[in-house]
C-alpha cells in the first residue's frame, strides 16, 4: 500500500513591520516617518523626528501668502506656550529659500523651503481649486489680506512674488510626530484656512492617543 505524501508544514507568517510613509499617499495617525535632516532658511539644521520632543509639522503655501501669515502670526504669539508644552514647530513653504527668507526671518520657529515639493509629496499634501473656492475659507482670506495691508503700512510686510511656480491653490496640512517617528495626529485641510488652531494643537499634544482629522 502506497503511503500518501505528507502535507508540508505551513511557513510561518512574516513578522509585522512598522508602517512607513507612503510617497504621495495621505498619512494617518500610527504611520511612521523616516529621520530627515532639514535646513531652515534661518538657523541651524534640524532633525525630524526630534528625539527629545514632539514636532508639529505644518505645510503652507507660498512666501508672503496672506492666509498663511495670518495663521503663523497666531502661532508666533503663543510660541513660548507651545514650547513649554514640549512641541517644536517646523513649517514648510514651497517657495525658494532666497525668496522665503525675507518673509519669515522674524518668526521664532523653523521655516523650511521645499520648492520642488518633495516633502509635500512624501506627506501626501495636495493642491486643489477648492482651497480658494470653498466659502469656509473666505473669512480667513479677507482677514489675511487686511492684516497684510496693515503690516505693509507699518513697514513690516512684503508683497508675495507675482509669479508662483508652485501654484496658489495649495491645501494646508498638520502633523504631530512623536520622538520615535510615529504620527500621533494628522489633519489635511479642506480649504485654505483649515488648520489646527493653537488651542487644538495643545489639546492634541496632551491627548490620550493617535487621531486623524
What is each of the regions a protein language model found here?
Residues 211-213:
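Cysteine/selenocysteine-centered motifs that mediate thiol-based redox chemistry or coordinate metal-sulfur cofactors
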Residues 114-193:
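Thiol/selenol-based redox catalytic cores and closely related redox-interacting motifs
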Residues 192-207:
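A short, polar/charged loop-to-alpha-helix boundary motif
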Residues 71-122:
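Structural microenvironment flanking redox-active thiols in thiol-disulfide oxidoreductases
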Residues 47-76, 89-92:
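Short active-site neighborhood of thiol/selenol oxidoreductases, capturing the structured segment around
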Residues 35, 55, 173:
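Conserved beta-strand and immediately adjacent loop positions that scaffold enzyme active sites
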Residues 2-48, 74:
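N-terminal "domain-start" segment that seeds a small globular fold
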Residues 51-52, 85, 170:
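Residue-level preference for short coil/turn positions at secondary-structure junctions
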